[in-house]
């Protein structure tokens, strides 16, 4: 149990907190068979455990991701039906906490983080995010209408409130974030717009009378019959947006008095119009880009706030050309999020890629992206969907953003663990590593950027302009060391990682450090672990006897995750 004297801040405590594993920083290996399109593109589709993949990205992408959107599995309770509630929530929180900590490190200072949840865990998740980001960096909880109260959902309406929403927690990393305001189309005509500026630009008429005169409405109809969704009506108000006006009060007393003196004539100033003591505001001031019938165009709009009720969740089955029942998010939802927080060329990341929606939208919007998916969906869903995007598919937001195809992506897998135990239990370098993979892995382990020099074989990676690393599986002799030293320039330093070396090499040169592998790696991190997702079948079943509470308290979350798994058992993350 946590010592009360050690608690120095308000925080959420759960079983397993503080037991986070030391993750091995893996290298990523491109699989050309599943890469597609422009070979020089920067877009990445990663197949592998998302916690290990995030760790693999940390060195090269820390502080570079502009927008992170994740849609982790909701802790619905279905997966944990037979298990102790305290353990259930602890496991979910432990998994999400580890991932968000790395995601935070990947965010740029002007970046945004969005996590999509329902109300089962959102309040716990907010406390976790408050701890990682700081409460002062919380932006909003956005409620998104995701369903309608009908069918089976309403069968228990006498026992519970029917769920109709999802929730989006939004955080920033610092005050450098700038939000691009977005707008939504009004659902009906605003009857305050009841004036129409005549062609003389001096007088006004009743908007209703103008509509009747132009046979938009009949003589018996009222302004409430003006239908914003009628194409004829819509064309009329868009065409005449500078003439259709509403009146508003104004603080400038002199202008109000001057306007009253004109009596039924418009007073024009440099920046405004006044009529009978009130300011005339044209409809054109309320036109903004909105999504309308799968297009983005100017229309009568309201500022988008924290309740989104206009996105269709019911007809996403055909988007992207892949099936993903009950879990696929609408393309227009992701488009809105990326429009709020990113610009063309910004880097977007989704570590729970699912069917590939976030990557597909980022691609169509001209953003760079990294998508991570653990399961077979990486090949069966994400790959074909992104391939279709490159080829110019026209579903989802394609017409709205005038997507014509192009670009590309590269498909990566995580390298196996660098060290494995032999039959005697000793840690040895995995035989799956060739010389290049080993050099790249050691560079990552030591914080160097793997970038082999064209002419100097021993300059395999560097951490600064004059600091280099060299990895070899050969026995390092004094002659080889002297040869390298002769090539080094003044001020250069070198780390050599090798399996063994001649004893005279040790300490011979002050600017050359020699380390033995694998000994130098032991104890640094957890080797041989390929999956940090949660197997939901093998959790300890809730016990009804009086020892249950003690059993739960002494259960390690890591031990649960490490329990024996079967290939056909689902994982939560």
Please report, for each region that a protein language model flagged, where it lies by residue.
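Conserved S-adenosyl-L-methionine
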Residues: 5-18, 89-95, 122, 330-399, ...
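Conserved Class I S-adenosyl-L-methionine
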Residues: 123-143
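DnaQ-like (DEDDh/DEDDy) 3′-5′ exonuclease domain used for proofreading
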Residues: 1-67, 76-98, 276, 498-501, ...
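Flexible, glycine/threonine-enriched loop-and-boundary segments that flank and lead into catalytic domains
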Residues: 41, 48-51, 56, 146-147, ...
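Active-site-adjacent helix-turn-beta-strand microarchitecture at beta-sheet edges
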Residues: 7-9, 158-167, 172-320, 331, ...
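SAM-dependent methyltransferase catalytic-core segment centered on the flexible catalytic loop
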Residues: 33-36, 48-51, 55-112, 120, ...
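PRPP-dependent phosphoribosyltransferase catalytic core
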Residues: 370-573
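Class I S-adenosyl-L-methionine
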Residues: 139-171
């Amino acid at each position: 149990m946590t010592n009360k004297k050690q608690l120095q801040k308000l925080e959420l405590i759960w079983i397993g907190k503080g037991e986070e594993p030391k993750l091995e920083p893996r290298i990523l290996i491109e699989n050309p068979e599943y890469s597609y399109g422009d070979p020089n593109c920067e877009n990445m589709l990663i197949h592998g455990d998302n916690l290990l993949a995030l760790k693999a990205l940390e060195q090269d992408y820390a502080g570079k991701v502009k927008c992170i959107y994740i849609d982790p599995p909701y802790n619905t309770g279905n997966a944990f039906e037979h298990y102790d509630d305290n353990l259930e929530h602890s496991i979910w929180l432990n998994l999400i906490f580890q991932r968000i900590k790395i995601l935070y490190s990947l965010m740029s200072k002007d970046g945004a983080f969005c996590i999509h949840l329902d109300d089962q865990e959102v309040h716990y998740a907010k406390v976790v995010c408050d701890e990682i980001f700081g409460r002062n960096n919380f932006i909003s909880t956005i409620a998104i209408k995701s369903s309608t109260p009908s069918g089976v959902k309403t069968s228990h309406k006498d026992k519970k409130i029917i769920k109709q929403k999802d929730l989006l927690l939004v955080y920033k990393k610092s005050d450098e974030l700038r939000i691009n305001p977005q707008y939504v189309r009004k659902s009906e005509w605003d009857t305050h717009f009841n004036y129409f500026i005549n062609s003389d630009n001096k007088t006004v008429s009743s908007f209703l009378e103008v509509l009747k005169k132009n046979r938009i409405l009949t003589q018996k109809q009222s302004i409430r019959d003006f239908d914003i969704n009628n194409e004829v009506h819509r064309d009329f108000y868009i065409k005449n947006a500078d003439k259709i006006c509403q009146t508003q009060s104004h603080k400038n007393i002199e202008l109000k008095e001057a306007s009253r003196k004109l009596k039924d004539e418009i007073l024009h100033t440099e920046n405004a119009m006044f009529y009978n003591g009130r300011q005339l505001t044209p409809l054109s001031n309320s036109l903004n880009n909105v999504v309308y019938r799968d297009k983005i165009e100017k229309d009568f709009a309201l500022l988008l706030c924290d309740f989104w009720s206009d996105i269709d969740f019911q007809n996403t089955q055909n988007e992207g050309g892949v099936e993903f029942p009950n879990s696929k998010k609408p393309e227009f939802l992701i488009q809105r999020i990326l429009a709020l927080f990113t610009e063309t060329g910004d880097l977007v990341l989704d570590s729970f890629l699912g069917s590939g929606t976030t990557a597909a939208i980022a691609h169509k919007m001209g953003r760079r992206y990294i998508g991570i998916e653990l399961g077979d969906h990486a090949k069966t869903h994400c790959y074909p969907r992104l391939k279709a995007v490159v080829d110019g598919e026209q579903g989802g937001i394609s017409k709205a953003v005038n997507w014509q195809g192009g670009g590309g992506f590269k498909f990566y897998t995580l390298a196996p663990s660098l060290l494995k135990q032999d039959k005697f239990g000793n840690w040895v370098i995995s035989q799956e590593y060739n010389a290049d993979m080993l050099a790249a892995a050691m560079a990552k382990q030591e914080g160097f950027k793997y970038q082999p020099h064209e002419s100097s074989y021993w300059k395999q990676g560097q951490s600064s302009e004059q600091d280099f690393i060299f990895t070899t599986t050969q026995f390092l002799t004094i002659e080889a060391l002297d040869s390298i030293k002769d090539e080094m320039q003044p001020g250069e330093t070198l780390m050599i990682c090798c399996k063994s070396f001649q004893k005279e090499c040790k300490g011979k040169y002050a600017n050359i450090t020699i380390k033995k592998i694998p000994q130098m790696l032991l104890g640094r991190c957890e080797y041989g672990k390929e999956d940090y997702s949660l197997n939901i079948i093998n959790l300890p079943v809730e016990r009804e006897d009086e020892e249950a509470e003690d059993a739960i308290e002494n259960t390690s979350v890591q031990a649960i995750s490490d329990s024996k798994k079967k290939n056909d058992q689902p994982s939560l993350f």
